Each structure stands twice: as C-alpha cells, then as structure tokens.
Swiss-Prot record:
It is found in: Virion membrane; Host apical cell membrane. It catalyses: Hydrolysis of alpha-(2->3)-, alpha-(2->6)-, alpha-(2->8)- glycosidic linkages of terminal sialic acid residues in oligosaccharides, glycoproteins, glycolipids, colominic acid and synthetic substrates. It comes from Influenza A virus (strain A/Memphis/4/1980 H3N2). Glycans are attached at N61, N70, N86, N146, N200, N234, N402. This is Neuraminidase.
Length: 469
C-alpha cells in the first residue's frame, strides 16, 4: 500500500469513528431530553372525560432550566392543583402521646430578643406546622415588658412562626389582636383577629394575607374567640366567638366563613350554659369543639357544628373526671353529659378533650386549684357514659411543681388517618413570680402515637433568678 493509500485509509477510519461518535452524542442528547420531558409531562384527560367545573387555584408556574452540552432547554413544570381540605379520613388509633416540639422561649429570653407572649397555639397547613401567640408589642428584656400581665392592649399582635422557632425580632406580625384563631382551608390561611375597646371591639377576618370581612361586638362586652385553631371543611371554616359576661350568661355565636367572608352566623343552641375558648377539631362531616364554662361548670362544654346546614348542638363531656381548673377532687367531681355540674364553675382555664369511640382522651392541670402541672389520660366510657371515672394510660407532661397554663388541640392529616396533637402553655412571671414585672410563656407540644412511650416532665425550665426583671 503506497503512502497515499495509507493516508486515505487512515482518514476514512477516522471519519467513520468521528461519525459514530457524533451519532452517539446525538442519541444521548435525544434520550436525555426525552426522559426529562417525560418526567414532567402533564397528563391530559382522555377523550369524553367530564372534568369538574368548580373553581380551582393553580399555583404560580415554575420554569425549570436544564443545561445539556451548552444547549439551554426550557420546560414548564405542570401546575399543581390546590384543593380544599375535607378531613374525611378516620381518626388515628393511639395508645398515648409522644413529645413533638418545645420552643424554650423563656430560657432563650435570658440572652436574646424574644417576644413577650401569651395565649399560644399550633395549627398546620397541608405541609407544615406553625406556632402562633399573642405578642405584647415588646421583647422580654425591654422596659415595655413591665405589667404585661394585662390581656387586652392595642399593642398586642398575632405572631406566626414555624413550629419550634421562638418568636424572635424577625417574627411576622399577622394582624392586630388580643384574641385570635387561625386555620388553613387547603388553599390559604384564615386569621380571625379581635382588637379594640372592651365595649366595642372588632373582629377582622384576614384570608390569604388580605382583609376580607369584619364584625363588631354584638354584646359590647369583650368580644373574644378560641385562642386555638379553627377548622375548615370543604372550604367552609367555623369559628366560635363569645361576647358578654365571663361569669354569667354570655352570647356565643358560631361563624361560618368562606375564603374570609362571613356566610352565616348561628347562635349557640343546646344545653351548654357558658362557652368560651373552644378547642376544635374536624369530625367529618362536621366540627367538634370542647370548651371552657367560666360560669357554672368544671366539666367542659361540647359544641357540635354541622357545616352543611349550620345547625348547632351542645352538651358536656360525660367523664366524671372533669377537665377544668379549679375543680373538685376526682372522688367528688361529677358530670352527667347534659348540664354543667355546678362544681367550682366560676373561673377556669382553656383546655381540650376529644372523643375516641365511647371513650375520651383529655388533658388537664394536675393541681385542682391552680395552673400547675399537666397530665393526660383516657377515660373509658368518658364520651358516652354519665360520670364515668375509669382512667387508663395516664401521662405526666409537666410535673406538679412547675407551672402550666392554657392548652389546646390541633389536628394533623397523615396518609391514612388524622392525628390529634396538643400544646401546653408554660406561663412564667407575674402574678406568681414577683421578682420580675413581666408575664410570658413558652410551649411544649405532644402528638398522638400508636407506639410505646416512656415518662418524663417538660416544664418551661427557666431559672427566674437569671431572667431580666
């Protein structure tokens, strides 16, 4: 083979190899692009399939950019449909409660800028849980924190952070409020915020960050609401509000709200005599609330809300082991399901309970007279049998030597069931701890578990002698 032939042969082989490599690169590029587009391909409905006509919200479109061998390819990710929550799954079967979260706000206040708060609660959107509280318009290490034992001032605002994040200076102030409730309907947050003069307060209804509706005081005597989460089913949210005396008959109404707009108001009906600070949970197809009777009963009122026809039924928790504070000792206390027990009914504390078939799970202070300690347990027959007192699965959340406060319920939807969780307010400062001039709180949070669990105590834990005065 002469030199020219060798050159031609080598060139031909090189060209062939280069062509093969080029074709392979094209094949790889085509395969990569095809697989990427297929991953985000929007499925179209088959022919003749009927699609729902009700309004839906589509999240803001997102564009994904992929770089392949210096070529930019853009493909729009499919819009994600956002639907109202319906809470139709069954309630989770539990054996008790396991620790979930603790924010340690008071301990952190000894060396950092943390808000002075009270009336905390927890609520979750479909993807994340948040903690709320009513701030006093000041941090703890600030002279404005003096005399923050007062409940109602124009400086109080509703604070909102991810659960477990203390209320630092960067915390969002959702609205002006000295009484509040919040819930997520599956599409956006609803906040009910009460503020103003005691004799002529205003409740603002804020949905998706916008003021949508409002209502003024109807009895001119401290309009107030739940201090825990409201509940939304298929786009209709319910919130229990009371206006009137805290120690005699008051005027309680249940408001039905759709995307921030009041669509109906129902008066309280049934045998409950006094209803305040309800802890509500979804009980499909309705809403159930366990509340505070601040007039006649140390047994807790129950309010059942029908979301479809706006009807209301009320009664009392049947358990003879009653949930309010103050109360009689367990030997002497009673409850017969329908009426207040007239046992140390004047005064009380926000609390919770929820039904489990014929039984009831509940939490309460360990002390019968003061907001000290906290315990949970199940009462067999406590939801259906008058004066039932068989207690099982008792747990200590806060030992009796430490302070507690308000407590309330919130619900979390899992893959197959709805779990019940609760929080406990851990109050510190005035009136009991007179070394300091402020009153504030931290929280501890537990959730239902079907597993096993141990024992412990989870108090606030701050050494009052180390705290700013």
């Amino acid at each position: 083979m002469n030199p020219n032939q060798k050159i031609i042969t080598i060139g031909s082989v090189s060209l062939t190899i280069a062509t093969i490599c080029f074709l392979m690169q094209i094949a790889i590029l085509v395969t990569t692009v095809t697989l990427h587009f297929k991953q985000y391909e929007c499925s179209s409905p088959p022919n003749n399939q009927v699609m729902p006509c009700e309004p839906i919200i589509i999240e803001r479109n997102i564009t994904e950019i992929v770089y392949l061998t210096n070529t930019t390819i853009e493909k729009e990710i499919c819009p994600k449909l956002v639907e109202y929550r319906n809470w139709s799954k069954p309630q989770c079967k539990i054996t008790g409660f396991a620790p979930f979260s603790k924010d340690n706000s008071i301990r952190l206040s000894a060396g950092g800028d943390i808000w002075v708060t009270r009336e905390p609660y927890v609520s979750c959107d479909p993807g994340k849980c948040y903690q709320f509280a009513l701030g006093q318009g000041t941090t703890l290490d600030n002279k404005h924190s003096n005399d923050t034992i007062h409940d109602r001032t124009p400086y109080r605002t509703l604070l909102m952070n991810e659960l477990g994040v203390p209320f630092h200076l960067g915390t969002r102030q959702v609205c002006i409020a000295w009484s509040s409730s919040s819930c997520h309907d599956g599409k956006a947050w609803l906040h009910v915020c009460v503020t103003g003069h005691d004799k002529n307060a205003t409740a603002s209804f804020i949905y998706d960050g916008r003021l949508v509706d409002s209502i003024g005081s109807w009895s001119k005597n401290i309009l107030r609401t739940q201090e825990s989460e409201c509940v939304c089913i298929n786009g209709t949210c319910t919130v229990v509000m009371t206006d009137g005396s805290a120690s005699e008959r008051a005027d309680t109404k249940i408001l039905f709200i759709e995307e921030g707009k009041i669509v109906h108001i129902s008066p309280l009906s049934g045998s409950a005599q006094h209803v305040e600070e309800c802890s509500c949970y979804p009980r499909y197809p309705g809403v159930r609330c366990v509340c505070r009777d601040n007039w006649k009963g140390s047994n807790r009122p129950v309010v059942d809300i029908n979301v479809k026809d706006y009807s209301i039924v009320s009664s009392y928790v049947c358990s003879g082991l009653v949930g309010d504070t103050p109360r009689k000792n367990d030997r002497s206390s009673s409850s017969y399901c329908r009426n207040p027990n007239n046992e140390k009914g004047n005064h009380g504390v926000k609390g919770w309970a929820f039904d489990d078939g014929n039984d009831v799970w509940m939490g309460r202070t360990i002390s019968e007279e003061s907001r000290s300690g906290y315990e949970t347990f199940k009462v067999i027959g406590g939801w259906s049998t008058p004066n039932s007192k068989l207690q099982i699965n008792r747990q200590v959340i806060v030992d009796s030597d430490n302070r507690s406060g308000y407590s309330g319920i919130f619900s979390v939807e899992g893959k197959s069931c709805i779990n019940r969780c609760f929080y406990v307010e851990l109050i510190r400062g005035r009136e009991q701890e007179t070394r300091v001039w402020w009153t504030s709180n931290s929280i501890v949070v537990f959730c239902g578990t079907s597993g096993t669990y141990g024992t412990g105590s989870w108090p606030d834990g701050a050494d009052i002698n180390l705290m700013p005065i």
